[in-house]
Amino acid sequence: MKFVDMTNITVIAGNGGNGCVSFQKSGRRASFLKKPNGSNGGNGGDVWLLADPNINTLNYFHSNCVFRAGHGQSGRSRGCTGKRGKDVIVKVPWGTRVSYKKTNKLLGDMGIHHKRLMVAKGGRHGLGNGHFKSSLHYCKVLNTNGSTGEFQHLLLELLLIANVGIFGLPNSGKSSFIRIISSAKPKVADYPFTTLVPYLGVVQINNYDRFIIADIPGIIKGASHGLGLGMRFLKHLEHCQILLHFIDIAPVDNSDPLENIITIQHELSNYNENLVRKPCWLIFNKIDLLEQQVAEKRINHVISSLKWKGRYYSISSIHNTNVLSLCNSIMKFIMHHTHS
């Protein structure tokens, strides 16, 4: 099934019902004295978005893109108010960003700022002539019509909700890592871009503690100008509490790990400077491919050259080296920052 994380929908609220014009005979001179008793119409139905944690893609909206609420009924005689139009509730994944398509103005992040959000308000009811009656039972203004409901074109963007986000160059071992520690099963192979869509995995530390981790396709130089796959999916890192930058310590193309880190950080900054400000750990992967002293020398060179003040870890996803220790550190970090 195709992974859909961006789509357009149209929402149409219901129109308000018209007010009723009717008269009740009053007294003996019924032909001259008529008491207005027409009632108001009903309000039009609203269109709401509802964040549902059980939905994880926008695939449904690929073939369902127009949502209409019910119209309010017109008022009737003898004080019978028109029935309100039926609301429409549209379920979207937790973490869906909602914007106006034309202006890109943000309406809200579902599940982050809003669990329930009105995106199109129904039209107001019209007034019946009973609303305008006077003490003389004379009505100059007979009635008013209901107003038209709102009509909106919306852009829905899904931002995956994860505690931890993984990024790096293609073939840095991200997918192997997430396969080992979680229930997610991304494709793993010895060629670039084996990860074509984001993956979510749940990492169970013990019976009580767990975290959610997101793996996005690899980022390459020039990604901020449209090259590669990863830039489109960087938005899925925006809600993460911590980022893990995976580095291949022994690249098969003999590229410099230091230059690779600088390249990726530059692309991240071009996309969104707020991502660069997030807590980030360097994860030096594939240490099994080098002798211990060589690996340590390369890592120390990178750390000193970058003047890196954050945490860093050396692991081997294939041999499970230091993986458990890293996961425990991640869990402690999340718990500390969640409750602080």
Swiss-Prot record:
Its cofactor is Mg(2+). GO terms for molecular function: GTP binding; GTPase activity; magnesium ion binding. It comes from the Bacteria. PROSITE patterns: G_OBG, GTP1_OBG, OBG. GTP binds at residues 168-175, 193-197, 215-218, 285-288, 316-318. Residues 1-161 form the Obg domain. One of its GO terms (cellular component) is cytoplasm. It comes from Blochmanniella pennsylvanica (strain BPEN). SUPFAM superfamilies: Obg GTP-binding protein N-terminal domain, P-loop containing nucleoside triphosphate hydrolases. Monomer. The lineage of its organism: Bacteria, Pseudomonadati, Pseudomonadota, Gammaproteobacteria, Enterobacterales. The gene is obg. The keyword ATP-binding does not apply. This is GTPase Obg. Its EC number is 3.6.5.-. Belongs to the TRAFAC class OBG-HflX-like GTPase superfamily. OBG GTPase family. GO terms for biological process: ribosome biogenesis. It is found in: Cytoplasm. Keywords: Cytoplasm, GTP-binding, Hydrolase, Magnesium, Metal-binding, Nucleotide-binding.
